[in-house]
């Protein structure tokens, strides 16, 4: 065991008698004060099915730490349920919770001089929140994903929570009746686990597996299956070994690791939120990662997995087909993955993938062969233009034509937009603008799943565009562009668009444009005034004051001094 344990600051020497006295009260004995103290950041909560099974995993982590020769100390972290808060004022707290989680893990681990930490989370912001904390602290760390939910079933079809969101649009358009709507509601979420498609939670857990901060195959396991608990205990053993060998996050989270993550996110058809979160983690650790890197990688990596929201299958199907390691092996064989990247186990990516088959199983079509991809290029395009000089993120999977030019339909909030869609006031060819929903303007950069699902449900998914300085749920698909930067609140051009202006979204040319002269835009800009802050105190007020542009990951600790 290393002599440079951080916890020696509270366990060694006569001056630490009172410290040890308190530790004895929580279970330490004479032989435990030379062991590494390992934090268990427990995201258990009954707020959401994503996190409701995590307490059992945390107990398995404790057992694993003890068996490996460490002393666990468990503490809680918060979560917000994106699915439950979606479409409400509460959604403004979702992205904020990412930074609250990061702050809480950093505070507990550094405040208690812990030697390492195993973080266990489920809902979307749990993953990046934990990883930001790990990047800040740079102590041995591993992430355990709470696991994915199994699909619901109704009328012979697999359901996810997004099925319920889309059913609202179908119902308002008269396509389904009240009984069908209620049946979908009752069957969409059958138990514990995070939302089942390749939505944000499963995207980020997959990214962390690729980056080497979670164990192989762990990101696609079902929350309720025994292998998830077994993997948690194994993760604890791996972490204690990393403490002994001082394998640190900043040795793992290199430029190569981020490039690997982006490649796999493209290959599995992952969430737009991954762009924001990876930028934030890279920003924290000092890795030079920009929006342009996502576009470069997108152009060379095909979408190999036919997963919801735009595809047919859910994450448990991906697990059965070989999981993330199978996708990684295919990318490695085609020169699109850095095999020499280090992982928390001490092995390289290439070493971990050595025994993984070169090709996916023949009797499935969840993971396509290299010669028969779902799409020849990645699905997350970075657009720029006079509407987004810093950039914006477009999700172009599941759309027949990634180009549209049409009249702007301008809304100052998500609620106004949703009301218009459900009232049948949006027509084919329209380009919806939802603004003042950015990191500062919202604040909190709400996800627009309710409006986009209503568009899909109304049958307008291929004929209506939607642009916002807010975000999209991982469950969103269609011709949608989010993360527009600069945002409206800080004077971005999206705040100058007027009803009826001609707007162009062109994913092929990577263009996001309002077709108005520069002279006209300059005149509008001269007359524009920043709105009063929506919140001046409390968590949201503090967040709006500190948060950076989405093009930098919307972090809250950049350029503080």
Curated annotation (Swiss-Prot):
Enzyme class: lyase
PROSITE patterns reported in the protein's UniProt record: ILVD_EDD_1 (PS00886), ILVD_EDD_2 (PS00887)
EC number, UniProt record: 4.2.1.9
Modified residues (N6-carboxylysine): 125
Superkingdom, natural source: Bacteria
Annotated keywords: 2Fe-2S, Amino-acid biosynthesis, Branched-chain amino acid biosynthesis, Iron, Iron-sulfur, Lyase, Magnesium, Metal-binding
Catalytic residue positions: 473
Keyword 4Fe-4S carried by entry: no
Disulfide bonds: none
Assembly description: Homodimer.
Name of the protein: Dihydroxy-acid dehydratase
Taxonomic path: Bacteria, Bacillati, Cyanobacteriota, Cyanophyceae, Oscillatoriophycideae
Gene this chain is encoded by: ilvD
